[in-house]
Amino acid sequence: VTCRACDTSHWLDAKPCAGALVSRGGKLLLVRRAHEPWKGAWDLPGGFCAPREHPREAAAREVREETALEVQVGAIVGMWIDSYAPDGPGADKVTLNIYFNATIAGENETRPDSPDVAEIGWFAAEQLPQPLAFPGHLPEVLQAWRAAQERAPRPSSVTSRTALLRTPEPTL
């Protein structure tokens, strides 16, 4: 974008952001935002990457800062482009949002550990709260998580596993 007043070019490069899909017992960790944009809406733990910070490191840091949980960051879920704010300050801030699956490392309890977080909750795929922050991409991220939950292998019962392991008796 070129400023008409000073004829200076301003680049609207996407700012890298990282987030984590932390699940426990089939439920997903979400945080309620305490500040604009999207104050009061539910979001995944995440935020902007620090200069020269790898998105995996940023995802783990953001989870720790927002919830006090230590996580092991796993596979990438996907990347989405969006705007940081719907309008007003920050509306021109384009973001590249990179999401990872993550698992809890340790036994620590969640607690809002940041002024950016008003509340923390664990939600089943069919009971995700509303409103959601960042409607330009978060619903798609959550849909990807739900689809992965539906594809995940379900543990079979001990009886059926045992039956599969038995070798049939030979017939003579």
PLM regions and their residue ranges:
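Unchanged
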Residues: C49-A75, W80-H137, V141, P170-L172
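Residues embedded in well-ordered beta-strands
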Residues: G19-L21, K27-L29, N97-N101
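Conserved beta-strand segments that form the floor/walls of ligand-binding pockets within enzyme
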Residues: T2, L29-L30, D43, A75, ...
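Active-site donor-binding loop signature of nucleotide-sugar glycosyltransferases
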Residues: A5, R33, G46, A102, ...
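Conserved Nudix-box catalytic region and its N-terminal flanking loop in Nudix hydrolases
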Residues: S23-E65
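Acidic, metal-coordinating catalytic segment for phosphate/diphosphate chemistry
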Residues: V1-G19
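Charged phosphate-binding loop/patch that engages nucleotide di/tri-phosphates or the phosphate backbone
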Residues: E140-L172
